């Protein structure tokens, strides 16, 4: 069970975007893509077959999962734990003890 999932609101706790918040767009094995965070400029060649024009595009790149933390109700970074409730594993915030949605 992943501790961080798509749709979670997270805060960056390390790196060039430290302190910024965003919503998780995708989760890979050990990396997360966060909306509007870790933007890089990529040069794109024009391709008439795809109908794209050339130029420089800003693209969101993945961050390592250890560099982000879930935001709790108070707006602070929180670690996520896993516990068993009624025979099912659920994620909970270590700071407040609140259970995260499935």
UniProtKB/Swiss-Prot annotation:
GO CC field: ribonucleoprotein complex; ribosome
Name of the protein: Large ribosomal subunit protein uL24
Entry function: One of two assembly initiator proteins, it binds directly to the 5'-end of the 23S rRNA, where it nucleates assembly of the 50S subunit. One of the proteins that surrounds the polypeptide exit tunnel on the outside of the subunit.
HAMAP family: Ribosomal_uL24_B
InterPro entries noted in UniProt: KOW (IPR005824), Rib_uL2_dom2 (IPR014722), Ribosomal_uL24 (IPR003256), Ribosomal_uL24_CS (IPR005825), Ribosomal_uL24_KOW (IPR041988), Translation_prot_SH3-like_sf (IPR008991)
UniProt GO MF annotations: rRNA binding; structural constituent of ribosome
Annotated organism of origin: Burkholderia multivorans (strain ATCC 17616 / 249)
GO aspect biological process, one term: translation
Sorted UniProt keywords: Ribonucleoprotein, Ribosomal protein, RNA-binding, rRNA-binding
Protein family membership: Belongs to the universal ribosomal protein uL24 family.
SMART domains (alphabetical): KOW (SM00739)
Signal peptide range: none
Higher taxonomy: Bacteria, Pseudomonadati, Pseudomonadota, Betaproteobacteria, Burkholderiales
Highest taxon listed in the record's lineage: Bacteria
One of the Pfam families matching this protein, by short name: ribosomal_L24
